[in-house]
Amino acid sequence: FGGTMKKRLSVLLLTLAVLLSGCSKPIDTTENSEKLQVVTSFYPMYLLAQAVTEGATELELRNMAQPQTGCLHDYELTISDMKLLENADVLIINGGGMESFLEQAMERYPDLVIVDTSHGIELLEEEEHHHHHEGETEEEHAEHSHGHDHEGNPHIWLSPERAAHQAEAMAAALGELDRADAELFAANAEAFHRAAHELEEKAHHIDIPEGECSAVFHEGFAYFAELFHMENVFGIFADEYQMPSAKELTEAVDEARGHGIRFFLTAADNGRIYAETLAAEVDEAIILLDPLTTADEENLSYLERMEKNIEAVEKHWKEETE
């Protein structure tokens, strides 16, 4: 992507648009009423919302998609999702085109307050995919959106600084609806932003030369390449529907050799085998990173999991330079 970024000015759906009929007052969260029911679309938003709402007494936080769902590309609402949203006051989404079911949810639940946390955040341009359906022509591949919003890369939670802005958007929105906890939300978001900034500083102090080449095998890891000032040469994204062809893999090996790529960033998913194959061709090791899209056994926080990712890159670089 060469550092190119694109401003996405999506609509912050909280802004009274869904509450124009005089319902824009704070939702009553006194002890005589039910608590504010807050739902997050998927696990990264749940992790951020946990940080923002820690210590709050007037809301209940639930996550919609199952903890092992992963990204929400092409996700369809289940019966249990619909039941959860029917009883929810607020739905917090990542935005940026991640939640393909959003229009359906808005139509089905017109009174649901939807907080789009991508509002005003700069998205990286979406990577040129190095995969397509077997037998597709290039024209068909270009038309095959695979459920993505091609205005930008929506995996913004993998940038600590952007995630901090998402947390602040959550705090501001929830504070308008739950005035009793508004100061708490703001303080939590501020503390999160400070910690996220420290993570970014830790990444920058690893002292990887600017412009070091990388290849990513998960779309979200373009944000990691940016964090470490890497030049991302290509991306290979595989799933159960799409796999890279032999020709594409051969071309990728040539690119890896030609650019001297030393950073192969992958998750423990379908892309891992391709990352390992290409890395082995140039006598390198993969860097296994956590996209934060699923629950982990240790129940770690967003900040803890991101710190482990940064440490994984640091460990790889130390081994490279020993």
Regions found by a protein language model. Name each.
Residues 22-322:
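Extracytoplasmic metal-acquisition and chelation regions
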Residues 1-4:
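Short, Lys/Arg-enriched N-terminal segments with co-localized hydrophobic residues
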Residues 8-26:
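Sec-dependent N-terminal signal peptides of Gram-positive bacterial secreted proteins and lipoproteins
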Residues 6-9, 78:
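Hydrophobic alpha-helical segments with strong N-terminal bias
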